[in-house]
Amino acid sequence: MAGGRPAGSAIEMEGAMRTLPSSGRPSGTGWQSRGPLFGRNYGLSPGSRLLPPRCQENADPQKMAFLLRKQWTLYSVSPLYKFSSADLKDYARMLGVFIAAEKQKGLAVDVDGELGIKVAMSGLPELRGSEQDPAAVLVQLSLRSSVSPKNSEEKLIWSGWFCCVAGDDLLENLPENFTCLPLFLVNGAESYTAIVGSWFQKTFDCCFRRLAISPLNLTWMAAMWTGCKVDKNTAATELLFSVPHLPQPLDISYAIHPEDAKALWDTVQKTPGEITQEEVDVFMECLYSHFHRHFKIHLSATKLVKVSTGIASAHCDGIIKFLQSQYLIGVLMLLTELAISQIQ
Amino acid sequence: MAVLRPFDKLPELNSATILLVGAEGGPQQQLAEAMLREKKDFNINIHLASSLPLPSERDHLRPRIDLIAFVIDIKSKYSLKNVQASLAYVDVRFFLGKVCFLVTGVGRANNCSVEMNAIWKLGEDYCSPVIFCELELEGIRVATAQRLLRMLQICAGRVPGVSALYFSLLMRNSAGD
């Protein structure tokens, strides 16, 4: 052997090797290997996006108020086959019957308090980006109190809505008889989501999937929402990071005064009304290096889990909360884009 | 700082050396162990480093490096920055087929923190193949280890008639769109 090296093979550590405990990931979590993983389309985001536009004044903010300050779980939906927005009343009746049947399954005795579920479906024509987009559809389940049917006191227990804001990419080459409402937002018990989902799946031959938001897209949201003007003083911009490869979970919360964040963003952004990937990177890099200077922690090595700003807050598991009605359309536009890229 | 050069040392008899560079220690170590477990008819030395440049004080002990694999974890933006910074300490002659980028974590698109365009661009800018894998899965780790071994064999000149440059050109053609 040359140089008197021992025969055989060896691993050698070079320099300052960080020896992290190689804690295995919990198996079976978040493993979703679908889609063209190795293709060039994977994990790409467009070079630039438009800033979320402010809503026009003619749209009534009160109408959309019930969508605000609630946690919505995101799903992506493939196009609905033979769906007609004129038949919403019939659909509501059919869904009501279906839910009653599902609830009765396996029950020998009719538990009447449980079964009085009323289904309402309505259109939300305000929620769209352009005339091309189909009107959003709202589904609400409410519990009838069987004690006093005359009072007709109803308690809302579950709501979900389908929407499509500026889904031009998908709308252009959609085959006939299909309606594209790629984004589905749910607030309520998961059991109802499953029942409603399976009815839509059977009736319109569509497919639901949870829509997770990747840390990369969360950085986009952080930058986009920081750049938005908000009238009054709002909550701090907060970024939540989780540190991987640790035996115990460790979360780092990074809160920035919204005005400071806006000031930083204004120095980064070059063309008004438009955001590029590069600008998003520079913005996050600035925040990371500031944090590193104070705490000697590389936030870029951690996972961005949650972004909350005065506009909205988003969690990587696909949970969103809208806080400003005027930017509702803008936020939905980005979410629609993500939903479309998931189903394509 | 010391730039890593491919040809300033003599090769050792019947052996080949690979250098794995990446910020995440755990998966790299596992990959190295998987490579050692593979059956092979030559000796391999695996050197692990979290970043370049390599410390110069042990330079005289280090064998000639035949292949450098930069490991990028798409879940960590830091790993990409780290690799980008390390590339400055590699001699240009390495990029004639003796460098590859190993991108791990590709099964978890939902955890992606890195813009994929940046990784593709890295491969194009440095004329080096980009290999996608998931080092946290045993099956893919073993397959990746085999693949790297085969590349190492070529880069060390142990496959008659196939040079590192020739091989990387082949890889580029097959990876091209």
Swiss-Prot record, chain A:
Please list every transmembrane segment annotated in the UniProt record, as residue ranges. none
**Region annotation Disordered: where it falls in the sequence:** 1-32
Presence of keyword Nucleus:
yes
Give GO cellular component annotations, separated by semicolons.
inner kinetochore; nucleus
Q: Which Pfam families match?
A: CENP-L
- Could you tell me where this protein is found in the cell? Nucleus; Chromosome, Centromere
Ranges of Polar residues compositional bias?
20-32
What is said about its interaction partners and assembly? Component of the CENPA-HI complex, at least composed of CENPH, CENPI, CENPK, CENPL, CENPM, CENPO and CENPP.
Q: Family, per the entry?
A: Belongs to the CENP-L/IML3 family.
What does this chain do?
Component of the CENPA-HI complex, a centromeric complex involved in assembly of kinetochore proteins, mitotic progression and chromosome segregation.
Q: Spell out the protein name for this chain.
A: Centromere protein L
Q: Which organism is it from?
A: Gallus gallus (Chicken)
Gene encoding this chain? CENPL
From Swiss-Prot, chain B:
| Subcellular location(s) of the protein | Nucleus; Chromosome, Centromere
Listed InterPro entries: Centromere_Cenp-M (IPR020987), P-loop_NTPase (IPR027417)
Keyword Nucleus listed? The answer is: yes
Q: Which UniProt keywords apply?
A: Centromere, Chromosome, Nucleus
Q: Where does the UniProt entry say this protein principally localizes?
A: nucleus
Please name one Pfam family that this protein belongs to.
CENP-M
* Keyword Nucleus included in the entry's annotation: yes
Q: Provide GO CC annotations from the record.
A: chromosome, centromeric region; nucleus
- Looking at the UniProt entry, the stretches that span the membrane are none
Please give the function described in this protein's UniProt entry: Component of the CENPA-HI complex, a centromeric complex involved in assembly of kinetochore proteins, mitotic progression and chromosome segregation.
Q: Tell me, how does this one assemble?
A: Component of the CENPA-HI complex, at least composed of CENPH, CENPI, CENPK, CENPL, CENPM, CENPO and CENPP.
This protein's name: Centromere protein M
Q: What organism is recorded for this protein?
A: Gallus gallus (Chicken)
